[in-house]
Amino acid sequence: MGANVLIMAGGTGGHVFPALACAREFQNRGYTVHWLGTPRGIENELVPNAGLPLHLINVTGLRGKGKLSLLKAPFVLLKAVWQARKVIRDVQPVCVLGFGGYVTGPGGVAAKLAGVPVIVHEQNAVAGTANRLLVPLAARVCEAFPNTFSASDKRRTTGNPVRTELFMDIARQALAGRKAHLLILGGSLGAEPLNKLLPEAVAQLPAELRPEIFHQAGKNHDEVTATRYREAGVEANVQPFIKDMAHAYGWADLVVCRAGALTVSELAAAGLPSLLVPLPHAIDDHQTRNAEYLAGEGAAFLLPQRTTGAADLAARLTEVLMQPERLNSMASTASRLAKPDATRTVVDICLEVAHG
């Protein structure tokens, strides 16, 4: 293999999955990828499974912590920077690419001190704290959504790296003569409100308008959600997880889900209209901002959880399911917003910076 690249991403799948997509692209171009993470994040499972060397530093978030933790914070951060600096010295990367999470701050500072160029990628419409703080140190800042960062020569709007199979042409059946297909992605984080809301809402639809339902309820939520559908007199296929998301997106005509950065990007990639119910307690309310992007362009409807009851959701479902041409228009708009070259673009930017 060729030169080394260091990727920094940790904590949640929202940071790690797009980073893994870029890791594969680097490997396809002959680079060796190393990963900087923390001991408690999802990267500890996903990165070794991908066959990538994982280097760990000890750092946690500071928001909402007590006074003692805040007093210790400078020493914790200094130690984390020192640990990251040792990794960089050992790996000797030509560039460092950060996707957010607690690891990104100390790792980015260590890279800058070592004279290694730093590139930042922000997945959400609102930049996370670590990425915001790294902007002055970064050679380039990549954003998934337009205008996440202030205008500068460093900024590039790239989109989010997502799984390539979602961009394959999907031959959906025409809605005429069949029931619509409704995909519900409850997930695991904040799943219960959607799992409770959907059976009640669909039960209020006229029988002739009720769609076929495929509902991902999340681990340990599937049985109670299936019971809710049965008690409401609604047929539904309820599963804890969906292993083949590309197939599920290809089946669907409409999606009801949260508005995480990757979900929003995948909806665009799959060309799917959606009803988005942002997680209300997400940091910086970034899910609402993500949803506003698709809704503002006409590819989705934004339904705030606090003000959306079963009757409200039923009314919106009725509105869109009775207008197949509107669903088609929303789907076309979603496809237009997709950025199928996001992974290649981010890697191109990194290598341009690394090699001049």
UniProtKB/Swiss-Prot annotation:
UniProt source species: Pseudomonas fluorescens (strain SBW25)
GN (gene name): murG
Gene3D superfamilies in the record: Glycogen Phosphorylase B (3.40.50.2000)
Key words, A-Z: Cell cycle, Cell division, Cell inner membrane, Cell membrane, Cell shape, Cell wall biogenesis/degradation, Glycosyltransferase, Membrane, Peptidoglycan synthesis, Transferase
GO molecular function, one term: undecaprenyldiphospho-muramoylpentapeptide beta-N-acetylglucosaminyltransferase activity
Transmembrane segments: none
GO biological process, one term: regulation of cell shape
Source taxonomy: Bacteria, Pseudomonadati, Pseudomonadota, Gammaproteobacteria, Pseudomonadales
Keyword Lipid metabolism assigned: no
Primary location group: membrane
Protein name in the entry: UDP-N-acetylglucosamine--N-acetylmuramyl-(pentapeptide) pyrophosphoryl-undecaprenol N-acetylglucosamine transferase
